[in-house]
Amino acid sequence: MSKIKTRFAPSPTGYLHVGGARTALYSWLYSRHNKGEFVLRIEDTDLERSTQEAINAIMDGMNWLNLNWDEGPYYQTKRFDRYNQAIDQMLEQGNAYRCYCSKEHLEALRETQMANGEKPRYDGRCRDNPCQHDPAQPHVVRFRNPQEGSVIFNDQIRGPIEFSNQELDDLIIRRTDGSPTYNFCVVIDDWDMEITHVIRGEDHINNTPRQINILKALGAPVPEYAHVSMILGDDGKKLSKRHGAVSVMQYRDDGYLPEALLNYLVRLGWSHGDQEIFSIEEMTELFSLDAINKSASAFNTEKLQWLNHHYINTLPPEKVAVHLAWHIEQQGIDSRNGPQLVDLIKLLGERCKTLKEMAESCRYFYEDFAEFDADAAKKHLRPVARQPLEVVHAKLASITDWTPENVHHAIQSTADELEVGMGKVGMPLRVAATGAGQSPGVDVTIHAIGQPRTLSRINQALEFIAQRETQS
């Protein structure tokens, strides 16, 4: 058996969305599972809509997901000479012909067919027309599609699919301006690049019989095809921006880990028993096309958040820290003056579903604040809190070995000494140290904030209470 070779071939007319990312992942996994090769091809024949910005977005998304490619990126716009050479060869062999039909004729034909309830298709007027035309006249080139028989292919996901050749008209393969069309470029690329398995969305099923017929006319091998179902929103409608169908890089910006998004995407159609959590190594080992479901999958943001929370708390903190550093930088926080990011992840991981949420909630570890949260201060920085804060300040100041255990002992001994519950000490201390009413355990939080900064903030809270007393 020849080496398995797959490809991901996006059109750079927009960002890399989740559907495209899933297709890329499935193609990548199939090649990696079979120790084959994965090709990246940019199908940029739509010159009006293709942009460099979109190409960059595709590359950024692939790199962020760590879907590396063995060949490419190939660009179709750089291969026009090759496509036109193949078209000229087909003209010589009689597998293609020049069509001189005017736009007006084709539009009138279409209107007549639709009025008669027929499927619009080219009527073959120039297919066997003996009339001679000057090749310099404006014309397109059409593929001479077989008029009898059927195209049958065994879809690796859906099983046998059959199209009657009578349903397929003669496809334009070169436009009037001399540029080759999408369906023809795809065929030549898959042939030249020795693609063995084409894994793509179900919206390409109708292109497949046309492409197979062109491949056969060229004497080229026909690859295996696998068409994955679309992704729906949780309301059963086609996924769109209102469902959260944004670019892959938007998920990065929103604080998702690539491992979480990959795990989520692989399960949108593929399964292995009841298993939900898959490392990339497990995906590679277990992946197969016959385990992909034919039916559409529904996108569920809550499930993605659950997976992201799982990976935040189970991946090596050093790995998560690399991604968290970017989010903290986006918040304008200098993380050099505070706890190590690996320690921050251990502190906040259980409380945060995304890295963005973590970055937004960690500022007090690295920067002083000008004021306390109004509700938290009103509730906990009252005159009754002055004595607990003064006593715990003294005990914290006397610590020579700043550990979570010693911090906890200082808080506990303050409560014991004043004969009050831990909350009477811990809550005012939390608000004093963090500026807010919620945080991880007050002892580990204060330990991470550090001794000098904690003592300074307690003094700030005592001043706040004193001002409050004078105003009352």
Curated annotation (Swiss-Prot):
EC numbers, comma separated: 6.1.1.17
Ligand binding (Zn(2+)): C99, C101, C126, D128
Cofactor: Zn(2+)
Broad EC category: ligase
Self-association state and partner proteins as the record states: Monomer.
Organism (species): Photorhabdus laumondii subsp. laumondii (strain DSM 15139 / CIP 105565 / TT01)
Catalytically driven reaction(s): tRNA(Glu) + L-glutamate + ATP = L-glutamyl-tRNA(Glu) + AMP + diphosphate
Compartments in which it is found: Cytoplasm
Entries under Pfam families matching the protein: Anticodon_2, tRNA-synt_1c
Highest taxon, organism lineage: Bacteria
Name of the protein this chain belongs to: Glutamate--tRNA ligase
Disulfide bonds: none
Role summary: Catalyzes the attachment of glutamate to tRNA(Glu) in a two-step reaction: glutamate is first activated by ATP to form Glu-AMP and then transferred to the acceptor end of tRNA(Glu).
GO molecular function: ATP binding; glutamate-tRNA ligase activity; tRNA binding; zinc ion binding
InterPro entries: aa-tRNA-synth_I_cd-bd (IPR045462), aa-tRNA-synth_I_codon-bd_sub2 (IPR020751), aa-tRNA-synth_I_CS (IPR001412), aa_tRNA-synth_I_cd-bd_sf (IPR008925), Glu-tRNA-ligase_bac/mito (IPR004527), Glu/Gln-tRNA-synth (IPR000924), Glu/Gln-tRNA-synth_Ib_cat-dom (IPR020058), GluQ/Sye (IPR049940)
